[in-house]
Amino acid sequence: PQDNTLIYFPTVVAIDKFIEQAHIQDQSLELDDNPILKDFVSWARREVHPQWSIIKALEKGFLVHHGQLPLGIRMLELSLFNNPDSHFSRLICTSTLLEGVNTSAKNIIITKPCRSYNKTFDAFDFYNLVGRTGRLYQHYLGVAHYIKTPQDPQYEKSAAVKSIEFELTDNSIDMDINFGNYSTHPEFVAVLNKLNITYEQYKSDIARKYRFSTVEFLLNNYYKYKSSLLDVLYQQNRNPNQSKLELIRVLCRILGMKEFNFKLNTFIINKLTYKYRQSIREVVDTTLQYYKNANLSDVINTTIRYKSSYIEFTFYSQVDLLRYFMECEQVSPSLISTLHERLMKNIEILYYLKSPSKKMLKDMGIYDGDIDNIIKVIGSDFSSVAELQSLLVRSYPKLNEISIVSKYVISGLIS
């Protein structure tokens, strides 16, 4: 059997391009012979898309691991890589593996020493990536292959000794705000005055959730697009049946979304914040009906990324800050309520932001489309992992109508 090998690419786009162009076919790999893989591919074709790059990779003998994939799928792919009986020996990955993920890899191939298109590794990151091999007590030494172009840097191990710095340094405005030393920062005082709030209010309502640079940026953009936002909310309030797409687009202008594919991306966000849950496949198919020239792989990846992390962790959080700005300015309560009812409430329900038990399942890797069905069987009377495990052990035989991804995660929890 081949030694396990990581193949590193800096971006998901680069991974998809490699998968599309790869002509390697491992004749010894028969997906139908592996019940887990057979079920996963069948589910992925229905839930995501038959042309999803992850399916193509599996058919060509590759596993894939990157941060845009839902957690449960990442866990499944990594488990297959570390299992010698799966016959998968090649895992394509991004810098997610720099975040402490251990594998059974003996080799790593570094195709480009970058975190993204323009963020070149320093020596610490480079050797951290090299150190992903030779772990899990499988190999005494790992082997790294660096595909170096004339423009790529030469790394010296002696330069990899780097002190760990906190994101908030002694010179940070956020640190000064936290300790009350803000008088030397007129830009912060200006924000307090614009919002007509005290330092104590800022510290309790804002500082714990947002960096000052984010607050300042969003506040400036809020003023820039305020009239458009209030106008759209007024129209939404008058006509509850009106599409919220224009509301999404004004909000994304304020949040600073890039112009490239702006209409396409906001269309996807709108679909992913409907009142009812849609599969990735449904969102992708509908999007392609309206944007016929869009790249299929880009639409799939964008939908997954927005659904898995962006809407919950960035979009909702920043829209909530805009709502706070509106309250500070004493905008009509009916318009603030409209923002919540037409958009924020949908996100809270769909992404389980107000349901601790469902959120726990999601954070453990359970696929979101299965969570409501699981709760129907086990109930929601648990607040710890131990209580959840006990309920899952008792109810596991009844959990038939869930995806292979969730079954895999649950089996790991109760084994």
Regions found by a protein language model. Give the residues of each.
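Conserved C-terminal RecA-like helicase domain
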Residues: 2-90, 105, 115-133, 146, ...
